[in-house]
Amino acid sequence: MSMVTNTGGPAQTTLLTRPFLIVTATAMVFFVYIGMLIPIVPLFIEGPLGLGEFGIGLTIAVFAASAIIARPMLGRLADRYGRRVLLVGGASVAGLAGIASSQVTEFWQLLVMRGIMGVGEAAVFVGAATLIADLSPRDRRAEGASYFSVAVFGGIGIGPIFGEFLLDDTQFERAFAAAGAFALLAAVVALFAPARVAPLDTVDETIASAAPASGRRKIMHPAAVMPGVVLASGVAAFSTFGAFIPDYSREVGLATSGGLFAAYSLTSVLVRIFGATLPERLGPRRAVTIALGTLMIGLAILAIVPTVAALWVASIFVGIGMAFNYPSLLALTVNRASDSDRAWAISSFTMFFEVGSVFGGLFIGGFAQVVGKQTGFFGGVVCCLVGLYLLRFKLVPAGSPDSGPSYQTAMTQAPVAAD
């Protein structure tokens, strides 16, 4: 497999190369699988398995916890054997678990399958996100992450529509098997992805953390911690939307939730396509403030206004919020790490997707079990407020070199005052 190299500065570098498109195609197909399971799993738990909100939350937590446990190993595997092995192996494992879920009859069996799916999803995401960072010039990483996330959110948006259609209220065996087939298809597409990519930029390796290469440093890259905590706040908030909407929308009066997920995903995709350069232009402080603020508004609408119209409006706000939440935080993490640490830093950062899911699944799920789904959306509002505080006062306070549009060069140049 030939290496991808850069022949010019950032202005001459083509971002949307063939390897870039292959990685995004892999992610697109794989996240159709993830999206299909969004309505299928909660309805399966509350239907054939006869459990409630806490059961839904527990499956989210198991999925996330297994991914968290696997993350440190996945980063090392990516550095040692290349990124492609994570894409192919992760998608294959997740696909087989999805197909096996079609034969589940007990809740504990579903928990085992969700745990295996979590490991597979983590492998695919670490491999794909690392390749996207490898393939993006330093000053265009947030833009690259925006385009990549179009595939992620496009798949998540299309998946629930397929899932609800194949489910047809009761056909769980067919729906699980079809979802697993999409993951296996993603593994086939991933065979054409590059295993490794030569650095596009010359980066000062002294950026790496001064922490010793043992103990906590092997598990968590320091550059990922605070961006990851802010990310986790948004993910925990969003988990209320993903977990509660399938059943709550039926309570309010919609026949299915597929359209709501499509509205959220389409909004997010459009923002990321037509506003792909906005994260770089705004800087992480402004971009992530928009993300958490609009996500909070959407969840507050769901908690306060129990109408069909409110569901659609809230879905659009959630889509805007999720469009801005991830790219700037990922780019900030990668730009604070050395090239040799990139897979480790991304593995550490993306671990916080699962940290947020665990918190949202267990604590907000338990809260909703007591107060009901509608009031449970307020748990997501609180998570957004926590994330905003950490972002604006801890991660990128006013005046920080990283707070404005010039943050992408802050680690290699003298500090520049924020706009």
Predicted ranges, named:
Residues 85-99, 180, 286-300:
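Structural signature of the two symmetry-related core transmembrane helices
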Residues 3-17, 195-228, 407-416:
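Juxtamembrane intracellular "pre-TM" segments in multi-pass secondary transporters
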Residues 64-72, 156-157, 265-273, 357-358:
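Residue-level signature of mid-helix packing/kink "hotspots" within the transmembrane helices
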Residues 70-82, 271-284, 368-369:
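Helix-to-loop junctions at the C-terminal end of transmembrane segments
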Residues 113-152:
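Cytoplasmic helix-loop-helix junction between adjacent transmembrane helices
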Residues 108-116, 298, 309-317:
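Paired small-residue
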Residues 69-105:
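Conserved MFS/SLC helix-loop-helix module at the cytosolic interface between two early adjacent transmembrane helices
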Residues 50, 82, 103-108, 283, ...:
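Helix-breaking motifs and short loop linkers at transmembrane-helix boundaries and internal kinks
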